[in-house]
A protein has these predicted regions:
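Short acidic beta-strand-loop surface patches of small beta-rich interaction domains
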Residues: 75-91
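A structural signal for short, hydrophobic beta-strand segments that form beta-sheets
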Residues: 48, 76-77, 154
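Short, charged beta-turn/beta-strand-edge "cap" motif at the junction between a beta-strand
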Residues: 61-71, 81-83
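Residue-level recognition of conserved beta-strand edge/terminus positions
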Residues: 26, 59-61, 78, 146
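Low-complexity, rRNA-contacting terminal tracts
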Residues: 7-43, 53, 89-175
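Short, well-ordered loop/turn sites that connect or cap secondary structure elements
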Residues: 49-52, 69
Length: 175
């Protein structure tokens, strides 16, 4: 980040210019078999996402750079993660990290792995005890400066397909 103090002619926009998001766009069109595309969100487009919550619908013009923007698309925010990889959770209505007690759901599988020797070789066994809960860190449902990945799904498509806009064919994205 830009470490100059605000009084040295640096504005909030200069600080935000160094930050980028990775937008993972899930194509919900059944012809594309649910393909996902990674795009970047940076510069002034970044401010369009700050303060948005999981479930909000955003315009696709703010995703991508240059000719590879998703103009005409409507995208729904379905999740994301921060700079440490902590997942966002829709039930938390804040933007910061919180430690909460959870059962098996988003961000926690709810089982223990036990390694045992059986028949001369080591095997992994999953034990899923009833009522297993753990304390895990989650990021709230609001997009902040610490967010590094945003998961989006297509709600309303434009005339041109995502594969055509991004210059990839469906064979390349499936390999």
């Amino acid at each position: 980040l830009n470490t100059r103090p605000m009084s040295a002619g640096c504005s909030r926009v200069d600080i935000m210019a160094d930050t980028t998001f990775v937008a993972v766009v899930n194509d919900t069109d059944s012809a594309n078999n649910g393909s996902s595309y990674n795009m970047t969100v940076s510069g002034n487009n970044l401010s369009q996402f700050l303060g948005k919550k999981i479930g909000d619908v955003v315009d696709g013009i703010f995703v991508g750079e240059g000719e590879q923007t998703l103009a005409g698309y409507k995208l729904e925010i379905t999740g994301g993660s921060d700079k440490t990889g902590t997942p966002m959770r829709s039930a938390l209505s804040v933007g910061n990290r919180q430690s909460i007690l959870v059962t098996a759901s988003t961000g926690f599988k709810g089982h223990n792995l036990v390694h045992k020797a059986k028949g001369g070789e080591k095997k992994r066994f999953r034990y899923k005890p009833d009522g297993m809960r753990k304390r895990r860190y989650f990021r709230g449902n609001t997009i902040t400066q610490d967010t590094r990945q945003i998961n989006l799904k297509v709600v309303e498509a434009a005339n041109k397909s995502l594969a055509d806009i991004l210059g990839t064919s469906s064979e390349e994205s499936s390999e």
